[in-house]
Amino acid sequence: MLFAEIFGYRIPMKAVILAGGRGTRLSEETQFKPKPLVEACGHPLIWHIMQNYALYGITDFVVLAGYKGQQIREYFANFWLNQADVTFDLSTPNREIHKVRSLPWKVTVIDTGVDTNTGGRLGRLKNSITEDFLLTYGDGVSDVNIQELISAHNRSENIATLTAIQPQARFGALKLNGNQVENFQEKPDGEGAWVNGGFLVLSPRIFSYLIEDKTSLEIDALPRIASEGKLGVYKHSGFWQPVDTIRDLQRLEEEIAKGSLPWV
């Protein structure tokens, strides 16, 4: 059962997924497919990401595609065809898909170009999003509590609220002051440093910081917003696994196999 059904709420918010990068560090897989379609225990990363959102009633998705984006379109176009028994009537164009459990999801796939940076990809939505929305990356899986993330954002007047986590010391760190991000650090101080976990709530005001295709959300926009005191934080202590390497993928599959993630 959905958490949204248990607690009696539905969140009419879009979830935007950045899915256009080349994923070069995972070239064993990404030479053949975009990274969001790399499979973990029989389902692509993007499926796992969307399932966690759906637990909280988030079912309106916008996928910002780029590298091998046609494969993402084909995945959703054939979503049920590849997951159920099917009967083809070769005398007609008809087909019958059997025993399908419907999903109340709406998925929009937008081509944002192969070499466009993250801020440029997001900037494509400037004229179509007028309310706060969710954003994440198509290569990181987490059981982050979306309701709590949204609530943290709504309690503030911030332009953006990001999810901070404490992984092993391999990522650039955040300098926090209470529930605000002060700045970004290239190298963390060691174990226990907070980093950007890649699950965000954004105000439409973000679009004024996304000037051109080469704008980086992480390097250009978010540090500027932090310097203005408008970048909030929600601290997540649960599961979080980015997938940049084969070993990362193995770690994710090990966690899925335990049955500890709420959507599997």
Identify what each model region corresponds to.
Residues H48, G120-R124, A221:
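Well-ordered alpha-helical segments embedded in enzymatic catalytic cores
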Residues I6-F79, V109:
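N-terminal glycine-rich phosphate-binding loop and ensuing alpha1 helix
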Residues Q71-G178:
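Conserved beta-loop-beta/alpha segment of the NTase-like Rossmann-fold superfamily
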Residues K14, F133-L134, V141-N154, Q166-A169, ...:
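Catalytic-core segments of class I nucleotidyltransferases/pyrophosphorylases
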Residues I17, V63, L135, A160-T163, ...:
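Structural beta-sheet core signal
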